[in-house]
Every structure is written in structure tokens, then in C-alpha cells.
Amino acid sequence: MSASMAATSTSSATATTFIKCVTVGDGAVGKTCLLISYTSNTFPTDYVPTVFDNFNANVLVDGKTVNLGLWDTAGQEDYNRVRPLSYRGADVFILAFSLISRPSFENIAKKWVPELRHYAPTVPIVLVGTKSDLRDNMQFPKNYPGACTIFPEQGQELRKEIGALAYIECSSKAQMNVKAVFDEAIKVVLHPPSKTKKRKRKIGLCHVL
């Protein structure tokens, strides 16, 4: 499968398929930064809690136009009652944790998966570890000696545990694997793995214009 994206806040009348993609995870793990980085190729230098407006991007997939709807959610407990309203009609969840935050990693299985499976039991999940640039920075352990980082093997184990269809590590600040996150989200919706051949599924490359 090949895909190219033309980011636009206006839906195309020629779009044949709509995919609603919702980001979920603890507060301050970088969900909003991920969306801003993907749609504008910029990185906000200051933390601002969930100010990303719902955004539509027209994506060309194998010659057909797909309208990708991106929804941001707030991870703080104050939003526990209103957050599930965003789950209605979701086609895929991007479930994010920070690679430099053990609590956000542990909350994936403790809090977020139970919540998603309660409100949207059949919607596929793409597990995403954010802030890989900090995790891989040799100065980080020196600057934050008490921090407990998460490594790829742990992320893959969590993916298997929760039944996510993919695991990707990314850095919004460094623009590393940002596009790959959303490419994967599109793929799991358009080409869901069969129950018998899930592990044999081959995934093509996507290209952004």
C-alpha cells in the first residue's frame, strides 16, 4: 500500500473513505505535539494541554482519496467523563505513552486499554512510544538520574499484552517516525489483518508529498 498526504483543514468532496483516528494516553506524553508535528511539521516549544483542534487531512492511498480525521483527547482525570465522547465512531486509536515515563507506560494496561475496550471494544489500537529523542540522549540519565526509561523490547511486550496491531517509537521534536505512526493507523483500518494470518501480513511503504 502506498500513500501520500496533502494536509488540509478542509475535507475534499472527492474523498471516498473517512477514517477517524483518535489519540489517547496520559497527559503530557506528547499526544498534541505528535499531531501538530504531523500536520504542520513544527514542534511547540512550550507545553500546552490539548489545544489541537480536530483536523482533516486528505490522504491518497493506492490512487484513492481517504479523508483522515485526527482527534485529540485530554488524559487528565478531570476529563474522564467527557473524553469517551470522542471515541464514538473511531476507526483506530493511537495509544501513546512517554518513553521516559514509567507511570504513563504502566497506565496503558491499567487505565487506557480497559477504557477503550469498554467504549470501543472492536476498534484497533496502534501503540506509540513518544519522546524517543530524550530516551536515546546520552545526557538524559545524567540530567534525570531518577528517570526510568522504556526500551523497544518492553514496548513490543506491551503491544502483545494488550493486543495492539503495531508498536512504533517516535520523536515529534526530531520528526522521527512521526509520519510512520499515522501511516500505520491508516493501514490497520484499510487492510486489517485476518485472524489466521495476522503475523504474516506484509505492509507496504507510504510516502508523503
From Swiss-Prot:
Motif Effector region in this chain: 47-55
Record-linked Pfam families: Ras
Domain of life, per lineage: Eukaryota
Name this protein carries in UniProt: Rac-like GTP-binding protein ARAC9
Entry's Gene Ontology molecular function annotations: GTP binding; GTPase activity
PANTHER family referenced in this protein's UniProt entry, alphabetically: RHO FAMILY GTPASE (PTHR24072)
Lineage, highest ranks first: Eukaryota, Viridiplantae, Streptophyta, Embryophyta, Tracheophyta
Subunit structure: Interacts with SPK1.
Binding site for GTP: 25-32, 72-76, 130-133
PROSITE patterns: RHO
Subcellular location: Cytoplasm; Membrane
Keyword check for Nucleotide-binding: yes
Cysteine methyl ester modification, residue list: 206
GO BP annotations listed: autophagy; small GTPase-mediated signal transduction
Family from the record: Belongs to the small GTPase superfamily. Rho family.
UniProt propeptide residues: 207-209
Membrane topology annotation: Peripheral membrane protein
One GO location term (cellular component): autophagosome membrane
Function summary: Inactive GDP-bound Rho GTPases reside in the cytosol, are found in a complex with Rho GDP-dissociation inhibitors (Rho GDIs), and are released from the GDI protein in order to translocate to membranes upon activation.
Residues with lipid group (S-geranylgeranyl cysteine): 206
UniProt keyword terms in alphabetical order: Cytoplasm, GTP-binding, Lipoprotein, Membrane, Methylation, Nucleotide-binding, Prenylation
Statement: the UniProt record of this protein carries the keyword Cell cycle: no
Gene behind this protein: ARAC9
